[in-house]
């Protein structure tokens, strides 16, 4: 090769290297300039984690690329909530029952003292309906929820919101809550082996099952056991709702009753009070504007899409003693849905 050709090749190579280095430097600088927004959720395989993972890209776009959104799974929502208030995240996966326990410092929050500002009402996304499932064989002897009292049951992992929901359900019914802790993937095995006689199943907006329950349903036939009429009356007297769930909406097989009965809880992703008002507002407004598109991503958003504003009001009213994030307060005032009895949390500018 001639010296001239060598010089040309060398120059071209140097230009390529320079271009790559420049691009890398720009990307690194961009990454360094972007702020971090961490969503803490329940463990991988749960509905809460799946939704947050799907929403991360939408959240980044809503914030104009200013933030890098990451999803951080934890053992359960209780731990995820604490992680945010200990500075390990900015937005926590939670539910109305979890917000109640946190405010009252009961259950997993007994004697808990956050090192960072507390979480505030920010965005409620979907209802879940807790119900009880068993095997086809066991269903012959399990006719009401009282038949699970004192028996080994997987009430979803300890600290999960559905676990907390069934704690208050059994308390209202004066039943013995005998929980067996399992890995999510062991749900079907434990039912088949008889290690547990029941397992709490849950639907989202009556239309979605958690990933581990989809796997369970594929490998075996299950039956949903509805609460009996006297149990429904006691639950309602205790202030708990009991709703109808069409089994065809979430289950792919026959699960017994033509209409299922579940006790709902409202799930959301609540931000720490010191998250800037503008950031929270942008997220909420984007989710509102894209509510019909979100249903296409996941049918669990159907209830939110039908009444986005009403769902936020419902979430606040479940725990009106908990302050509302300024970003949500601004949104609700724009939609004439603000209640002056609610409190607004202090926030960063």
Locate the predicted segments by residue.
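Bacterial N-terminal signal peptides that target proteins for export
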Residues: 1-15
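C-terminal segment of classical bacterial N-terminal signal peptides
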Residues: 17-28
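Bilobed "Venus flytrap"/periplasmic-binding protein-like clamshell domains
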Residues: 36-63, 67-70, 129-195, 203-207, ...
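Extracytoplasmic small-molecule ligand-binding "clamshell" domains
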Residues: 50-86, 255-257, 347
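Pocket-lining segment of extracytoplasmic ligand-binding domains
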Residues: 96-98, 105-114, 120-121, 137-138, ...
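Ligand-binding clefts/hinges and TM-proximal coupling segments of bilobed small-molecule sensing domains
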Residues: 149-168, 239-309
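An extracytoplasmic/periplasmic, membrane-proximal ligand-sensing/linker region
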Residues: 186, 203-224, 234-236, 278-349
């Amino acid at each position: 090769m001639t010296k001239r050709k060598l010089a040309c090749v060398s120059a071209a190579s140097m230009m390529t290297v320079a271009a790559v280095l420049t691009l890398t430097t720009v990307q690194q600088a961009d990454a360094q300039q972007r702020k971090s927004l961490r969503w803490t959720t329940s463990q991988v395989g749960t509905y809460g984690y799946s939704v947050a993972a799907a929403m991360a890209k939408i959240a980044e776009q809503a914030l104009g690329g200013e933030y890098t959104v990451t999803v951080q799974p934890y053992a359960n929502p209780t731990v995820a909530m604490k992680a945010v208030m200990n500075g390990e995240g900015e937005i926590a996966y939670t539910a109305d029952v979890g917000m109640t326990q946190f405010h009252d410092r009961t259950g997993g929050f007994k004697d808990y003292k956050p090192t960072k500002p507390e979480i505030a009402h920010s965005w409620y996304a979907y209802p879940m309906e807790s119900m009880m499932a068993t095997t086809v064989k066991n269903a012959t002897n399990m006719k009401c929820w009282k038949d699970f009292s004192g028996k080994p049951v997987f009430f979803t992992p300890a600290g999960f919101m559905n676990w907390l929901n069934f704690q208050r359900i059994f308390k209202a019914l004066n039943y013995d809550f005998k929980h067996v802790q399992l890995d999510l993937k062991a749900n079907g095995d434990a039912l088949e082996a008889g290690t547990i006689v029941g397992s709490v199943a849950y639907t989202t907006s009556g239309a979605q099952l958690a990933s581990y329950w989809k796997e369970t349903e594929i490998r075996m036939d299950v039956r949903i056991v509805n609460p009996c009429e006297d149990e429904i009356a006691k639950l309602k007297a205790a202030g708990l709702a009991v709703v109808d769930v069409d089994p065809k909406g979430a289950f792919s097989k026959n699960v017994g009753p033509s209409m299922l009965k579940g006790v709902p809880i409202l799930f959301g992703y609540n931000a720490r009070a010191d998250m800037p008002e503008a950031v929270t507002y942008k997220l909420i407004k984007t989710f509102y504007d894209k509510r019909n598109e979100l249903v296409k991503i996941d049918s669990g958003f159907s209830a939110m899409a039908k009444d986005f504003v009403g769902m936020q009001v419902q979430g606040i009213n479940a725990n009106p003693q908990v302050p509302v994030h300024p970003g949500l307060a601004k949104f609700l005032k724009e939609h004439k849905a603000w209640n002056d009895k609610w409190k607004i949390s202090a926030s960063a500018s």
